[in-house]
Amino acid sequence: MPAPTTTLLIEGSFTELADEFAQYIDALRKNEGASLQSEVAPLIEPLRQQEQSEEEPDRKQRDEVLKKLVGAAAVLNAAPEREIISAYNLLVHLVHQASNPDIFLSRICTYLAKPITTSPQFGPTLAISILTTIFNTLAPTDSSRFHVLLAIVAVIRQSGSSYAFEALKPQLAAQLPTWLSAWELDDEDAQKLHLAIADAAQASGDLELAQTHVVQALQTIPANESSSKEARDLAVRALTSALKSPAVFDFTSLTAADAIQALRSSDSTLFELLEIFTADTLDAYEDFIAATPLETISGGVLVDGAEALQTKMRLLTLASLAASTPSRSLPYTTIASALRVPVEDVEKWVIDTIRAGLVEGKLSQLRSEFLVHRATYRVFGEKQWAEVQGRLMVWRRSLESVLGVLRTERERYIRESMQAAAEEVGQGKSGDKGAKGGDRRRNPQQQQQSQPSQPQQAREVELVGGAE
């Protein structure tokens, strides 16, 4: 769905085009029922006179004409395939001249959301094309765009076309928050739109995006309505799809919703299961299932997901195990025991957990252990803070030990350097004395010339000694 605004270029006055459209509708009806042209003719005549005298048109009179035209426009879905787009474009052009186009556009969108009978194969494509044109003829802040987008999503859902939905997804990702803000939708309409997108995503096979919009729809429920039947049904839908989804491991957004919290009373076993998936391990899950079979939870909404639930619980258990181990090394036997799987299957489960983004690390087949580099904390409370504190203390002691070694080595280096320097100075002094004795024997005059340099040599020795 393109972003730029579209302008329809259609020649003719309102009365001429309205009369032409009425004739076209009559032709599609094939003389069934009263003539639309004869019905609108008395309404068009005053408007034609205003156009001829160049007076300001009576918009209320136009609205009366448009009520007749739009009311009969459902028959356009039976128009020849090659004429459908141009016929709807003409109607949209007329509607934009109403005092309040929103009233008529929402009804046109309803027509387009229904099947185009003359083109079963390309009907959805034609409908989306027309709806896209309508969407882009409206100002970005026009709330009528909401109804048009709903119709587009409905057509995509009914068609089940993954291609059409893939074309819409970039616009939803980039523009939907802006649209919702610009249209100033109330909670009910925002929820309606999110659920429509979720249904279209699910029909197209994008379960992850469907779950995202179900959760966003859940968040539109006010706190004072969180215990209503509608809120309960939506909360159960959101929670069950999240539990069964192979891509959802973080339940924070769900537990924060008032409607989910209200399940404590209405669906206590389902809420208890959520708490297990949020923070507990496979042991707790198996104990829970033994006492509360899936068939008894909220009418059996999770019965078809038994295998998916157990798989997810194993991955979450391994993530918790990796996050809580102090040594960052997990033996295969420990993992096998925690996951209730054979040791030879451990590597498969570790790889699946890595793919899920819950842990990072390295498998050591020689040592039969998993070396943990990073692990995701499923919850972060007092226990986790204590673990962090313990690890920080270990790192502190390690750093203090390293610092102590560095200090010792530095002191040894300084001491040895100073000792070596002192030895060099001592050797240099002995050499100077031997040289001076030989000079006195060979050349007394040269001895006298070299005497002034002695105080400087003495000062150098003192400086070195001072350094010692």
UniProtKB/Swiss-Prot annotation:
The protein's job, in short, is: Component of the eukaryotic translation initiation factor 3 (eIF-3) complex, which is involved in protein synthesis of a specialized repertoire of mRNAs and, together with other initiation factors, stimulates binding of mRNA and methionyl-tRNAi to the 40S ribosome. The eIF-3 complex specifically targets and initiates translation of a subset of mRNAs involved in cell proliferation.
Locations listed in the record: Cytoplasm
Where do the PCI domain residues begin and end?
206-377
Region feature Disordered, mapped onto this chain: 40-61, 419-468
- Residue ranges, compositional bias (Basic and acidic residues): 430-442
Under the heading InterPro entries, the entry gives:
COPS7/eIF3m (IPR045237), eIF3m (IPR027528), eIF3m_C_helix (IPR040750), PCI_dom (IPR000717)
Biological process GO terms, please?
Answer: cytoplasmic translational initiation; formation of cytoplasmic translation initiation complex
Keyword Cytoplasm found: yes
| Cellular component terms (Gene Ontology) | eukaryotic 43S preinitiation complex; eukaryotic 48S preinitiation complex; eukaryotic translation initiation factor 3 complex; eukaryotic translation initiation factor 3 complex, eIF3m
Tell me which Pfam families the record gives: eIF3m_C_helix, PCI
Subunit structure of this chain's protein: Component of the eukaryotic translation initiation factor 3 (eIF-3) complex.
Q: Which HAMAP family match?
A: eIF3m (MF_03012)
Looking up PROSITE patterns in the UniProt record yields:
PCI
Q: Which family does it belong to?
A: Belongs to the eIF-3 subunit M family.
Kindly list the GO molecular function terms attached to this UniProt entry: translation initiation factor activity
Originating species: Aspergillus fumigatus (strain ATCC MYA-4609 / CBS 101355 / FGSC A1100 / Af293) (Neosartorya fumigata)
**Which PANTHER family does this chain map to?**
COP9 SIGNALOSOME COMPLEX SUBUNIT 7/DENDRITIC CELL PROTEIN GA17, EUKARYOTIC TRANSLATION INITIATION FACTOR 3 SUBUNIT M
Q: Note the coiled coil stretches, chain numbering.
A: none
Q: Where is the composition biased (Low complexity)?
A: 444-457
Name this protein carries in UniProt: Eukaryotic translation initiation factor 3 subunit M
Q: Which UniProt keywords apply?
A: Cytoplasm, Initiation factor, Protein biosynthesis
